[in-house]
Amino acid sequence: MTNSTAHLLRKTTADWGLSLNDHQLAQFERYLDELMTWNERFNLTAVRDRAAMVRRHLLDSLWLARVWETPPDSLIDIGSGAGFPALPLKILYPALPVTLVEATGKKATFLRHVIDCLQLHNIRVLNERIETVGQNPTEREHYQVVTARAVAELRVLLEYALPLLRLGGHLLAPKGRHPEVEIAAAQNALALLGGEVSACLPVEIPDEEPRSLVIVTKTAPTPNRFPRAVGIPARRPL
């Protein structure tokens, strides 16, 4: 990480009330090194510029920590891909128990590689479809927080996420600048799955287009029939 990108990461997070030490900055640097190397073979991200990676991936992920008064006791990330937002949050909060769900084998291999490189603990990768994970009794209604970035439209994402949350837990769903259409289309899914949109926050990252964070709170148990079989939520949204 160049001095300028390290300064951007440290200064911006400090402005947000978050603190990064030298070890964490070194972990972020190694993370980007591995991402850029693996990206040449596996196309993990369309972003190639290192400074843009800091803004669009690292800072965009770390912004989610601003909504917590204290870190959650458990987090599961859906469709983790290259690890955003969960891996930056894990680096920020080393004690946070994290589960990454990634159905694509090559991406899951990359995630395990980065976890080993960064010597992260209390974190695991599930190379499974999210519909299968959501019907697993050991995972279902277990988590305080679900994160998912660029996975699906909100009404589909709700069927993936809400079965994993315990009552009072939260889905953090980064969205574009105007998520109102997605929220309106998700009202039936919210009613069926036991959730409500509790906040929609503006997200501002230096030199990036404004976007938003939709927060959904689980308010009632999710019926056992959800999530439906693999592929059905995306093909037939609620």
From Swiss-Prot:
Top EC class for this record: transferase
Record key words, sorted: Cytoplasm, Methyltransferase, rRNA processing, S-adenosyl-L-methionine, Transferase
Gene3D superfamilies, alphabetized: Vaccinia Virus protein VP39
Localization terms from the record: Cytoplasm
GO cellular component terms attached to this protein's record: cytosol
EC number annotated for this UniProt entry: 2.1.1.-
Principal localisation: cytoplasm
Residues reported to bind S-adenosyl-L-methionine: 79, 84, 102-104, 130-131, 149
SUPFAM superfamilies in the cross-refs: S-adenosyl-L-methionine-dependent methyltransferases
One Pfam family cited in the UniProt record for this chain: GidB
CDD domains from the UniProt entry: AdoMet_MTases
InterPro entries the record matches: rRNA_ssu_MeTfrase_G (IPR003682), SAM-dependent_MTases_sf (IPR029063)
GO molecular function, one term: rRNA (guanine-N7-)-methyltransferase activity
Keyword Glycoprotein in record: no
Superkingdom of the source species: Bacteria
KW rRNA processing (keyword) present: yes
HAMAP family: 16SrRNA_methyltr_G
NCBIfam families: rsmG_gidB
Family named by the database record: Belongs to the methyltransferase superfamily. RNA methyltransferase RsmG family.
Functional note: Specifically methylates the N7 position of a guanine in 16S rRNA.
Protein name: Ribosomal RNA small subunit methyltransferase G
Source species of the chain: Chloroflexus aurantiacus (strain ATCC 29366 / DSM 635 / J-10-fl)
Gene expressing this chain: rsmG
